[in-house]
Amino acid sequence: DEELRAALDEMFRHSSVLLAQEFIPTEFDWRIGLLDGEPLFACKYYMAKGHWQIYNHAHDDTGRNLCGAWETVPIYKAPQKVLDTAVKAAALIGKGLYGVDLKLINGRAVVIEINDNPSIDHKVEDAVLGDELYYRILNHFVHCLNRLHAQ
């Protein structure tokens, strides 16, 4: 109790708000990429070996960060509960480009975070759609700009 209070006091020196989240260990997180409210890509991000996150920022002997594997799957192969929850979560923010990270626990999809600037890496998030992924994203932003310009 005393150790927790000391840690909280230290954290509150740097921020007026703290967010606590239940630790839910899983083999991987789902990342559902959404564009304009629709699922765009689905990836499994596996935890770094011997670590509780997908990235282990404690460097290995070469000075590189250690990261877990990934697996990109077609949207139709992602669990429907994960897709539905990702769509609902992102809708609370808007219809832009989002990456929603979730865990599936006993049939329950739990949102871990919503990224408004999701990473889209070559041969990772684009592994299923290829160049079509980038075409869809660029086309979306061109339409947004055209709507703004027309006003």
Indicate where each model-derived feature is located.
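A short, polar/charged loop-to-alpha-helix boundary motif
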Residues: 49-59, 120-129
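Active-site nucleotide/adenylate-binding loops and adjacent lid/helix of ATP-dependent enzymes
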Residues: 1-30, 80-84, 148
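Short strand-connecting beta-turns/loops that link adjacent beta-strands
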Residues: 25-26, 37, 105-108
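A short beta-strand motif that forms the metal-chelation/ATP-contact edge
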Residues: 32-34, 108-122
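Short, surface-exposed charged micro-motifs
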Residues: 31, 43, 101
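A long amphipathic alpha-helix within ATP-dependent nucleotide-binding catalytic cores
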Residues: 14, 54-108, 132, 136-149
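Active-site flanking residues adjacent to catalytic metal/cofactor-binding acidic residues
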Residues: 21, 100, 112
